[in-house]
Amino acid sequence: MTARREIEAITARIAERSKPARQAYLERVEAAISAGPHRTVLSCGNLAHGFAACAPSDKAALAADRVPNLGIVTAYNDMLSAHQPFETFPALIREAAREAGGVAQVAGGVPAMCDGVTQGMPGMELSLFSRDVIAMAAAVGLSHNMFDAAVFLGVCDKIVPGLLIAALTFGHLPAVFIPAGPMTSGLPNDEKARIRQLYAEGKIGRAELLEAESRSYHGPGTCTFYGTANSNQMLMEIMGLHTPGASFVNPNTPLREALTKEAAKRALAITALGNEFTPVGRMFDERSVVNGVVGLHATGGSTNHTIHLIAMAAAAGISLTWQDISDLSDIVPLLARVYPNGLADVNHFHAAGGMGFLIRELIDAGYLHEDVRTVWGEGLRPYAIEPRLAPDGTVARPPALEKSGDDKVLTTAARPFQPTGGLKVLTGNLGRAIVKTSAVKPEKRIVEAPALVFHSQEELNAAFKAGLLDRDFVAVVRFQGPKANGMPELHRLTTVLGVLQDRGRKVALVTDGRMSGASGKVPAAIHVTPEALDGGTIARIEDGDVIRLDAEAGTLEVLVDDATLAARPAAAPDLSANGFGMGRELFAGFRALAARADMGAAVFG
């Protein structure tokens, strides 16, 4: 089925805008492909170093250059619950490779930080830039020229975008992404949020809060709310970089093991040594990008991807803009309600029909490009399935459920939860910003109130504890952009502002920083660009200025005349403390080079 005319028009616009960069990118990919399997250009000394530690049979196969070699790029560490399962994946992948007549080696490891651990801490100021570090670290591993394809083991917030940037940089190689899956359900997410608010109000102590948090985050796998990590998995599947049905199967299950081994075998099957050569640089095009944005809107996904998708697309020579994202939001309906956009978690979403149901609905309604190439082959329709374990231990894929298993969690395109997507671009005299509307009640989407200005989230939290915020206001938290301090997430403010909203106050947030993908019920204009340190109007706001945030109309304005604003000096706080501690001193160059949020906030030229 062909995509709707409006979807086709936006895709064509992206393709036309991207022509020079995309052509240059594809020329580089084709030049690398024409060189053939890269082990053939290695000297005997190079090659001997490359397989010195391999098993004798693998060494013999690689020496003869007769089998494909699969590079494993892993983001394993055992502090991240989502990445702990990856400890055993290389052994599974090696076993699968041998069964398929190939070899697999760990090409390299990349860092993986947990935003849940660093939230509200100095380390959070490294979070966004870790994406580009991950891309560079993966590139180092793949630069040995030993591999015919690569698999990428990653799940969480910056890890998957960084890995995809690296994969596209090595676009002459096939690339398959392998997830670990979500942890089993624990304390319901709405109950966790309620307990956090009680703690913020001083009604319970740290012991009670820690007990609740530990019941929420209790085992291996991805956090179960629909934040950036699970948005990543949705994107990889809907853009055809996972094998069908791989995203949301729990870790340490026979089905997850079968999916992992199958992904390794599939990566080997699509190398230049076989008959289905699928280099990721050819495969991933503007249709793939649009499918990703459509999936993001249809599920109410993470605001972080209004930054990451732009950076990922750019790695393939594709120019995606906030306007494209906004225009698609006006077209694509919301089909999923997963916390913070609802009460269910991703396990409930998967049980209700999951990615297969969602993809089928979006294809049949004309919102997705079906005519794409994926790691599985031609077309996206094979992803409209439900993964199951077959009696022989392999993966079976019957068609997706005809009806949603729970229409409060997952619905049809004919009966959407709302007619438009979950993300919107705001414009006005404060610049441009992003707001996530899918978790905000319609009556809370317009706020007009005096500004209270803060230069850190700690300042706002201190004002709350001092009892100074029990009123209507718009919190302006500035100097949180990429150039100022690395654009940290300000997710801790959600609890404080949520308490005030529950007391009946009209509250909103305006910031040049980010919010977590889990951010919810309080309207928040985030990623304000230009940022305060880059000459943005947000640097000229003063306490008492009336700000109007209208998430319905898509506007963000300070109600002060232009002449008055222009005459004001920009605030210039001392930001020297941002440059030291927890490794921040090593990232001064990143802060200096970072692009604007609406350009992907990348440090690469």
Predicted regions and their residues:
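Catalytic or ion-coupling anion/metal-binding cores of large enzyme and transporter domains
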Residues: 1-68, 74-78, 82, 91-108, ...
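Contiguous domain-boundary segments centered on the initiation and propagation of an alpha-helix
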Residues: 131-138, 143-150, 461-472, 476
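N-terminal glycine-rich "phosphate-gripper" loop used for MgATP/nucleotide binding
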Residues: 131, 153-156, 353
